[in-house]
Amino acid sequence: MAHKKGASSSRNGRDSNAKRLGVKRFAGQVVSAGEILVRQRGTRFHPGTNVRRGDDDTLFALASGRVRFGRSGKRRAVSVDT
């Protein structure tokens, strides 16, 4: 058995907490203004009508209505139909 821990084993053993990213409200769901629709890093989804992007790229509803996922050119977009 080794009497020393080896190259880097004592320096390993850390991990960051999960960030709970992903789609929070799915297509067809009814949402209120201010509800978070998608939590993301970068713009995997882009904001469509009645949706804005927060500082951390989170998409949230500006108005109450029904969530719709679609395309805006080549981009995937999230909209809220009132």
UniProtKB/Swiss-Prot annotation:
Keyword entries, A-Z: Ribonucleoprotein, Ribosomal protein
Pfam families linked to this entry: Ribosomal_L27 (PF01016)
GO CC terms, sorted: cytosolic large ribosomal subunit
Single GO biological process annotation from the record: translation
Disordered: annotated span: 1-21
Recorded coiled-coil stretches: none
MF GO annotations: structural constituent of ribosome
InterPro entries documented for this protein: Ribosomal_bL27, Ribosomal_bL27_CS
Family from the record: Belongs to the bacterial ribosomal protein bL27 family.
PANTHER family registered for this protein in UniProt: LARGE RIBOSOMAL SUBUNIT PROTEIN BL27M, RIBOSOMAL PROTEIN L27
Name the UniProt record assigns to this protein: Large ribosomal subunit protein bL27
Originating species: Tropheryma whipplei (strain Twist)
